[in-house]
Every structure is written in structure tokens, then in C-alpha cells.
């Protein structure tokens, strides 16, 4: 998958800024997991071994955006579980996009047709299957 030129430039500028400021260690990608639950039970995935107490937990929109702001990384990857199960995933993605962060929404695509229309097209949003 090719990385769009705008993303290359923005991430490159972020890297240069960190170097110029003398920052030695800085985040590049935030792995944001708003939930562990999935609509599949793949044997190779360790998430299915978690108890229902863990699988039923959800991060709120506020908690997700607070993590994005605190981390400061230019790229946010949202893996799963299956993020499209989260009832507020659209609001989470919109909040991240509004912050001009590049979002990679990783999905198994089983719920994509049902939910795709809810997401506004953006140069900051990439769906990864």
C-alpha cells in the first residue's frame, strides 16, 4: 500500500521538527484499541482468549481523543477486535481526523458495507482490510 504524498510530507515534517527540537524519543504511531471484541473468533488471534469482562470494555470518545492528544503521534492506527462494532467509532474517527491525524482503521470488512456510508471521505482516513 503506497503512502499518500501529503502523509509522507506531514510525517516527514514531524520527524524533522522532533530532531530540530532535540527530542530523541517520540511517538510515530499511536495504536488505539477502543475495544477488544470482534465479530470473528480466529484461532490465531489471542483476543478470543480474554474474558467477557475485558471483551465488553469500551473506551469512550473522550478517552480515545484524550489519548490521541496526549500521545501527539501524527498517525493513529485503530486495530481490533473489530472497531466497526464500537457504537461511537464514527465519532472517534471524526475527532481524530479533525485533529489532522492520519487514521488507519483496520477492519475484517464484514461490517464495512453496512457502515461505510457513515464515514466522511478524508485524506486523513484510510481503511485497511
Predicted regions and their residues:
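Conserved alpha-helical substructure of the radical SAM core
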Residues: 2-115, 124
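Non-cysteine beta-strand/loop elements that form the S-adenosyl-L-methionine
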Residues: 122-129
Amino acid at each position: 500500500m503506497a503512502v499518500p504524498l501529503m502523509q509522507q510530507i506531514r510525517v516527514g515534517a514531524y520527524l524533522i521538527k522532533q530532531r530540530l527540537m532535540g527530542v530523541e524519543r517520540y511517538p510515530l504511531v499511536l495504536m488505539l484499541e477502543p475495544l477488544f471484541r470482534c465479530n470473528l473468533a480466529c484461532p490465531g488471534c489471542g483476543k478470543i482468549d480474554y474474558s467477557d469482562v475485558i471483551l465488553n470494555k469500551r473506551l469512550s470518545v473522550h478517552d480515545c481523543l484524550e489519548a490521541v492528544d496526549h500521545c501527539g503521534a501524527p498517525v493513529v492506527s485503530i486495530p481490533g477486535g473489530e472497531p466497526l462494532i464500537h457504537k461511537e467509532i464514527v465519532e472517534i474517527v471524526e475527532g481524530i481526523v479533525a485533529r489532522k491525524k492520519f487514521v488507519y482503521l483496520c477492519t475484517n470488512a464484514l461490517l464495512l458495507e453496512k457502515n461505510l456510508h457513515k464515514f466522511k471521505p478524508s485524506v486523513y482516513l484510510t481503511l485497511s482490510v
